[in-house]
Amino acid sequence: RDLGIRVIGSISKPINRSKIEALLDRVELKTAPPAKSFTQFELSEAEIRAGLAADAIRLVYQPKVDAVSLDMVGVEALLRWETPDGALLGPGAVVPVAERTGLMFTLTQAIFKAAMLQLSQWCQAGYRWKVSCNFSVSDLTESSIVRVLEDALTASGAPTDLVILEVTESKLSEDVSRVMSSLTRMRLKGCGISIDDFGTGFSSMEQLRRFPFTELK
């Protein structure tokens, strides 16, 4: 306790059966309280709008490591949301609401812009890590998606060959033609395309062959 460590019991060596039984006799079974509803942690539409205006988006980056060399070769940008009191919330508090209220594309634009600025800074420091950003099907069916991404790339100076657009496989069957058009246009500009959660959806191999993906996850 003096070290800030809490334990349910301890056994000194040598260990014998009587010591183990004595320790188990002290065990008290507890029932975990019911998990709070996930929706209790969701922000409101008004909070998201206010946060977007106040630049509440914070990104953390999950590293991707080469299995052979063990070198870090890239990162995936993950959303965190800073509340007015300084707390950081995960994407589950933001994304479902954004999808329901038509704010998803605005949110995605802000995330992509921030990620590209970070990528540009890393490149200037000599680190050429590929950066993956997640996109929803609703993002990829927006008529202005390619122009928006091009603008963010131009403004940041981030190299397109280090950018990976990531989309979940199970969503690829939604509005296939428009999604494929957006992905193909960005692939032609040099961006990589990643299919996330591969094998968990219902996409046929024939359909997957139509998409210009460069990696499967």
Model regions and ranges:
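Hydrophobic faces of well-ordered beta-strands that scaffold small-molecule active sites
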Residues: L59, V75-L79, F105-L107, V131-C133, ...
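Active-site core of bacterial EAL-family cyclic-dinucleotide phosphodiesterase domains
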Residues: K36-V97, N134, I195
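Alpha4 helix (beta4-alpha4-beta5 surface) of REC/receiver domains from two-component response regulators
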Residues: R1-S10
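The C-terminal output helix
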Residues: L24-Q40
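Catalytic core of bacterial c-di-GMP phosphodiesterases, primarily the EAL and HD-GYP domains
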Residues: L103-R178
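The catalytic core of metal-dependent phosphodiesterases that act on cyclic dinucleotides
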Residues: A152-K217
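C-terminal output helix
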Residues: R6, I15-L24
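Conserved long alpha-helical elements within nucleotide-processing catalytic cores of c-di-GMP signaling
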Residues: V95-P96, F105, T184
